[in-house]
Amino acid sequence: MKLTSHEARVIGCLLEKEKTTPEQYPLSLNGLTLACNQKSSREPVMNLSEADTQAALDSLAKKRLVAEQSGFGSRVVKYKHRFCNTEFSDLQLSEDKVAIICLLLLRGPQTAGELRTRSNRLYGFNDVAQVEQALNSLAQMEPALVRQLPREPGKRESRFIELISEAETQLDTQLATQPAQASSLANDELVERVALLEQQVAELKLQVAELLGKI
């Protein structure tokens, strides 16, 4: 079952904070909501309420992808992922692959070059070739966790998308509607140009009539 955009953001944040701020991990509901709504390193930027985050956590708990953890003497419930690399996880990934999945969940489709540039706090890739090797490995898993997208016109590199959430379906729908939108825009522009030409012709006729009247 694919993750929703809110669930994907929650898992991505838990993966990120586990690596970048281990002293604050697991995360409280408030801390996780703040992480989900960060304006940096997030695409798109979200504005989740704590109720939204809690709903995503409840759904992920049913999928056995997150678990609660209460500290000794603390009433604050904290949350940790069970997405990968835990005793309860079927999925076992090396650190480089976790970094890539984390970035794709948090920032959407990206090129290998973008992933290398943005991964410095998660994993130290030596070069883009190492990123591509990890991406190819993720794409060849069963089931595949990433997919290479067709290269966009005017772009030098192809982007990669994660296959864990609904992002792929949403992107395919978006791409399918673009030709229709482009056609609609072209028709609108044509109508405007015809109307402008008709106006210019009418003005010329008026000018000719005025000139003939003066002869």
Swiss-Prot record:
Domain of life: Bacteria
UniProt xrefs under InterPro entries: DUF480 (IPR007432), WH-like_DNA-bd_sf (IPR036388), WH_DNA-bd_sf (IPR036390)
Protein family according to the UniProt entry: Belongs to the UPF0502 family.
HAMAP family given in the database record: UPF0502 (MF_01584)
Protein's UniProt name: UPF0502 protein Shew_1617
